[in-house]
Amino acid sequence: LIESLGLGAFTVHTGVYEPAFPPDVGNDEVAAAAGYDIGEIAGRHDRAYATEAMSEGMEKLIPRLYEQGKFDGILSFGGSGGTSLVTPAMRALPIGVPKLMVSTMASGNVSQYVGTSDILMMPSIVDVSGLNSFSTKIFSNAVFAMAGMVSFESKQQIEHKPLVAATMFGVTTPCITRAQEYLEQRGYEVLVFHATGAGGQSMEALINGGFIKG
């Protein structure tokens, strides 16, 4: 379906057994990225161990592949195991890179999967196990959404101004708005984060990433 839209499909095998079709990146390469041997992982017959090992490999390998220009967006389908395996790799990618996770876990608390990143979570409605009339529609919608994100980039001109972070509650909105106007008049760009939920964590992630100047 991806290729029928005129896009390229770059596949990564995250399972521990033989794939259903030849992937672009084999599970041996994924495992090796974190110092594991795929034969040893498969030989244990331990789902939790395999998930953790392959997740570590994905977290290290996926950002490297992105830097090499192998893909422009990442799309994955999974249940609880697949979601916990792939989302750490998604979180390791820069903000702005399209990331879409179709998951059985998407209708609940997804903070452990999304963290401070911009992962989009889409409920799979039915289990991610084969194709049926419902899953085919959901999976197709996910492909179309990803195709749109990688095909249509924002044309807005980005001005590289020094970034200043501010946190805000509803009751402090007038104060922060006034401070924002003051700083922007002096050549700064102000990023406002909600002071509850993941807002503060997102701000700290950008600070740790070296984006924030004050």
PLM segments and residue spans:
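Short, acidic/small-residue loops that bind anionic groups at enzyme active sites
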Residues: 73, 85-114, 123, 191-195
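Glycine-rich, charge-decorated loop segments at or immediately adjacent to ligand/cofactor-binding or catalytic sites
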Residues: 107-116, 201-207
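Cap/lid and interdomain-hinge subdomains that line or gate substrate/regulatory clefts
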Residues: 42-43, 109-171
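Phosphate/nucleotide-donor binding subsite
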Residues: 22-68
